[in-house]
Amino acid sequence: MTLNSLPAWNSLQTHYGQIRDARLRDWFAPENDPAPTRAERFTLSGGGLAADFSKNRITDDTLKLLVQLAREAQVETRRDAMFAGETVNPTEGRAVLHTALRASNPTSPFYGKVQAERAKMAAFADKVRSGEWTGYTGKRIRHVVNIGIGGSDLGPKMVVHALQHLATPEISTHFVSNVDGADLYRVLQQINPEETLAIIVSKTFTTLETMTNANSLRDWFIQKGCPESELAKHFVGVSANPAEVVKFGIAQENVFEMWDWVGGRYSLWSAVGLSIVIAIGPKQFDELLAGANEMDEHFRSAPLERNLPVLMGMIGIWYRNFFGSQSYLVAPYSEALHFLPSYLQQLEMESNGKQACLDGSFVTYDTSAVTWGEPGTNGQHAFFQMLHQGPTIVPIDFVAVLTPEHPLVSHHPKLLANCFAQSEALMLGRTREEAEKVAGRDKPDLVPHIMFPGNRPTTTLLVDALTARSLGALIALYEHKVLVQGTVWNINSFDQWGVELGKILGKVVEADLTAATVDETKHDSSTSALIARARAALKR
């Protein structure tokens, strides 16, 4: 049975027609919001986090129907299959077991392997952090450069930045991902070879961007005076292809393993997170894993009606497939969470930006929305104008950290006030009558410009304090939300074939850019013209 023929889907279509013009402002009016209030009914806790869903365009009936749809779409079955290690990534014939990386269950068949690799990471990190691990001149390591792209970059970078207040001040962590040489060159200006450790992260150890940067960094070390025989003191590798790592020149004992049952965008919990362990230490990394595991257990055991990942996922489907929203915004009111939106872009869109169902048919409904965002309050001075008064409705996740991780505590009430006020303003709007009072009798022409439609939906996620544990829970919440939505859409959330075609053609174009002659019939006229212009520029 296809998604749009499920009974709950059809009931939701009818229900949407009944409430699409309802106003959040009216639902929150005191006469319409007796105890238990909307805020009380629609605020849930789990995994150490709280989520206020009350400013969404939902009723109790909406949630009942969304949960019914989740059940009819077999969300529980697929969730349990993932945790059991079944092949839930059929196009690649793989299990999906990032949750095993943070599980505390010693009966898991992967427990021993995971614990052994984690112990190896911890021992290595302790050596680097203590100064026992030194470079080729005997100096301690003061710079760690993580070279990777996609999941080998976005997750670790986001976590290291978020938990900088927990990081050792002795070591600076740098991230290089882009094949644009400017990215690596920027970092080279900040480091010196005697005190630098490079972590090369690639599942295959053949990724174009990663290996281009790794080779350039290795050449830089040699040019700066590091003997080739001493390079092993400055390079470690993380890969599922250890033979290729050794071929690159990294010592076997400096190879950390990742597994094909962990997808790149779910891999920060593995050896891919080695830069995290070095930055914040093994104990804090364990806390990160523990927080994620706490959310895993909530996802596995909480009834769907009180299950945070399920409700987040289903409310997202409500806007995407019934309201027709094309994008959704993540606005963390925390500078520490600066890279959360870019991390979630990959997690959400690479996972669920799919057109093919699991059975090979094509979807007849929308899948992943465009995910975007920027920390508050910066975003208020950039794109919130559109959110408040534009004709397009963009659902928003606000993420608020209730206690600051820094000593400038007087700033924090202002930050939180802006977050909560934005959610209230987006919900309430400003009516014509209210606008007329603001404009006054002498400025009637201003009224249309200062009216706000309101009724803009938001969810506010509350984090008591930004700790390694709470961050782990927050990340896992979004991971499981992705599974919920992918299951309902009947797509494979764990492959990424969409990145392959461009890679293949990229190799052809790269060869043409540097070849002595080019067969212009190989490409369309536009691509051929672009190549010709680039060839001319590269010869200057």
UniProtKB/Swiss-Prot annotation:
Catalytic activities: alpha-D-glucose 6-phosphate = beta-D-fructose 6-phosphate
Catalytic residues of the enzyme: E350 (proton donor), H381, K503
Keyword Cytoplasm part of the UniProt annotation: yes
Any one biological process term the GO annotation gives: glycolytic process
Pathway assignment: Carbohydrate biosynthesis; gluconeogenesis; Carbohydrate degradation; glycolysis; D-glyceraldehyde 3-phosphate and glycerone phosphate from D-glucose: step 2/4
Subcellular location per the Swiss-Prot or TrEMBL entry: Cytoplasm
Keyword Signal carried by entry: no
Pfam families reported for this sequence: PGI
Keywords: Cytoplasm, Gluconeogenesis, Glycolysis, Isomerase
Gene3D superfamilies per UniProt: 1.10.1390.10, Glucose-6-phosphate isomerase like protein, domain 1
UniProt superkingdom: Bacteria
Annotated function: Catalyzes the reversible isomerization of glucose-6-phosphate to fructose-6-phosphate.
Protein name: Glucose-6-phosphate isomerase
Organism: Paraburkholderia phymatum (strain DSM 17167 / CIP 108236 / LMG 21445 / STM815)
Gene name, Swiss-Prot/TrEMBL: pgi
